[in-house]
From Swiss-Prot:
Keywords: Nucleus, Phytochrome signaling pathway
GO biological process: protein ubiquitination; red, far-red light phototransduction
Location in the cell: Nucleus
Subunit: Probable component of the CDD complex, which probably also contains DET1.
Protein's name in the database: DNA damage-binding protein 1
Signal peptide residue numbers: none
Organism: Solanum lycopersicum (Tomato)
Cellular component terms (Gene Ontology): nucleus
Pfam families on file: Beta-prop_RSE1_1st, Beta-prop_RSE1_2nd, CPSF_A
Main location per the UniProt record: nucleus
Pathway connected to this protein: Protein modification; protein ubiquitination
Amino acid sequence: MSVWNYVVTAHKPTNVTHSCVGNFTGPQELNLIIAKCTRIEIHLLTPQGLQPMLDVPIYGRIATLELFRPHGETQDLLFIATERYKFCVLQWDTEASEVITRAMGDVSDRIGRPTDNGQIGIIDPDCRLIGLHLYDGLFKVIPFDNKGQLKEAFNIRLEELQVLDIKFLYGCPKPTIVVLYQDNKDARHVKTYEVSLKDKDFIEGPWAQNNLDNGASLLIPVPPPLCGVLIIGEETIVYCSASAFKAIPIRPSITRAYGRVDADGSRYLLGDHNGLLHLLVITHEKEKVTGLKIELLGETSIASTISYLDNAFVFIGSSYGDSQLVKLNLQPDTKGSYVEVLERYVNLGPIVDFCVVDLERQGQGQVVTCSGAYKDGSLRIVRNGIGINEQASVELQGIKGMWSLRSATDDPYDTFLVVSFISETRVLAMNLEDELEETEIEGFNSQVQTLFCHDAVYNQLVQVTSNSVRLVSSTSRDLKNEWFAPVGYSVNVATANATQVLLATGGGHLVYLEIGDGVLNEVKYAKLDYDISCLDINPIGENPNYSNIAAVGMWTDISVRIYSLPDLNLITKEQLGGEIIPRSVLMCSFEGISYLLCALGDGHLLNFVLSMSTGELTDRKKVSLGTQPITLRTFSSKDTTHVFAASDRPTVIYSSNKKLLYSNVNLKEVSHMCPFNVAAFPDSLAIAKEGELTIGTIDEIQKLHIRSIPLGEHARRISHQEQTRTFALCSVKYTQSNADDPEMHFVRLLDDQTFEFISTYPLDQFEYGCSILSCSFSDDSNVYYCIGTAYVMPEENEPTKGRILVFIVEDGKLQLIAEKETKGAVYSLNAFNGKLLAAINQKIQLYKWASREDGGSRELQTECGHHGHILALYVQTRGDFIVVGDLMKSISLLIFKHEEGAIEERARDYNANWMSAVEILDDDIYLGAENNFNLFTVRKNSEGATDEERSRLEVVGEYHLGEFVNRFRHGSLVMRLPDSDVGQIPTVIFGTVNGVIGVIASLPHDQYLFLEKLQTNLRKVIKGVGGLSHEQWRSFYNEKKTVDAKNFLDGDLIESFLDLSRNRMEEISKAMSVPVEELMKRVEELTRLH
């Protein structure tokens, strides 16, 4: 790998951090707006559910997301503040269907200590000001003028230092905040302040409340007519206002999120740390509060946000499990729950650990993650591409084409599968045992190759061969009519739909027929300048059985043309360029947009937007799908039409957000595909591969596939052992009932195909699993699982005791073979030259696997070690080199010296980085992630002139990822095909707290320089949402310094080139002096890295 790295997201963040509801896209439209840390999604509430409208990246980690409506506005605006102290106000532009920036700014202060409890951003309900609590002891005010525009910000001193929450109160003549804080004796109180915009200061507020519940952590301001505030504690809930005080006890719980149900604020939904959803009701007589009631509704994912939508629909956003759309029912179900889950939205966060495995054994990596937390813990199997689930298969050599036919026009299912060979045609059908067997359609000519078949109107079937077109009854299967090719000519290309047939005979002759009841009419004939290579009349206009236009691909001038039907007049001619002929053309419609797809003989695909009214072709784009000729066919899955491109690299073409996407199919070469929708296997596909025909159903159409294995407990570490086909986990189960020991820790063994627990080893009380490894030792052919643990005692700051456990898998059971006590937590385990390397608190320890003195079994024996770390948390090895990521002392490089049998330090990075993960890219370059969401690389300086130079790891790359990385692993999510340009590029995968799976690819220097130039040009063309700067966002940032990113490129920005309109692509092409086609090809190739 190299110094020049490309960072790209394979799976976007899914951890929902904020959500809000309001009329953002229109005065009458109700929107749910969701923040996923560095992205926002805008949804529209429709009778059918939530409809996505926009999903955009934000160049910052979102700290505040609030809707508000200044005076004189008919719809809401969106206020966003980021963790790096930028803010913006966004407005919906209905014309362009995108967000525009109303205001933006920077609210950082030169001095000031960032708050420990996170940033707070709030908006006065009467839109007089925005309040921000970003630094201890300061409250920042951004006032509005009377036109709703923002004025200059100022700070007010806030004497409460340990602030837990701040909200604006409703119904106050002057803007008033309520502050929940903790004093230096750990008691909690609430205070109110009026904000005087004139004096730029606080005035004592109308009331205060001292000595609340010790767990009070959340304020909920109550709107008029009641006003006042709810204070949510761990054991009590209090309603407080200038005139009233009401309190009720609750079962001990930590409330994580709330959502207001009614506009008058009399009912609230509360979500706690166990995922229990309660309804809190304020009882009142007119405007006088009489009491509080709380009722358990049921269980959801552990909520980080709750947004009440409408008509009892509620969005539950989660950071520890899947987010949900739920409905609250008036009557409980059989389990007593009022909560009904309607939709689940996958969330991989937090990814605490993962491993890369090839479970299908087909050369493609899958990532198995430890995802979620507490009761929502799960394993997720993530793989790229679309799988085909095989239902039936038969051995057949030399298939030249396939079509499915029905036995009647209105039959919902297909009956026949016509399979064409070089000198015959066979007809297959499903028998009663759901097996494929051969049958006959008497009216078909089975002694010759079929060029095309189709269902036709009036319960007919049409078969085109080289010398005729046959029209056959689908009920009696008899021949009804036949059209013969003129003497001396034979048909070489043909296509048909339910009412039309278009065919080409040699010499550029084009013949158009129409199908009647028992008749074939030759309607029109035309002579073209060159031979015809491919045809399509797939009806995508108003009439599902008739097309007004035909697409024709030509030899010699290498063009694609659009002709009118029935008169065969030329409407459009598009030169394709190059020397490779079009092999397959297809007109299709995705999300209401008509396209012409044109596949070439060398694996390239062109797509154009096709105007149905004028036949015009625009917005030309070219991608490389494979290296062999491609054939295109449409198919349906879940009531949506997609296109299957069969070739040496089969691909499904689909559309999302009106953009064409390409997802590889997990099959080796496919020569032909056709939909085969039979009753036994609905929505199936027939697929011809080398020597066999397979019938199978297709996965959901998306780029990444995620399978969930709910565990009901939190998996913290995972390892795979290929020899035993198992996974081993370190996991923790949280029990609510048993208060003495709320956590139980286990080592669990899972089958790698079924993912069922097959064996469990419970750890001791207070013992945590910290690390896990599958390895073998010198002079021992067995494969073992080694587990590193720590005893976490309540009274100790740092564990002083742990164990290393060595297990073998026998008959699907974990057998403990050896254990070794340690003087601290075993944070990391690595296989090292046939020995075991452990990181234990501040030291690195090497163990050998040796026979015991009694000569019987084996044990771990200490060989040597190395002190000198604060806490050695992350370790990677390569050869004799050991790279250590320290709690706070960045990265150091150690070496094991065989002769002396000792480990010594060779070099270190002298910066203070608090590490979260490390990986070795190559002999000299090491990658690190740290707790300010940055990535960096360091280089070993073996050529240094002095010892001092050689002892320093030089920082060579820096980048702000904006994500907390928990683990790096070498590997790839995609099939590595040696013939592709990216086949040789080494990659590292990472997993983050927000559920991001990312890829870091090391590039050759010339490619890096080219892409760096492209990135610079893209920054000028693509502006960040809210005016946020991409350059600032990607700059390495911690408490001590901010420096521009270097030797890292943002793949997400680079790949967004493919979403640009043609004229913006041309703008970039001009600036780079590189043709658009070339830019698209180079960026397309990169998308194949993930």
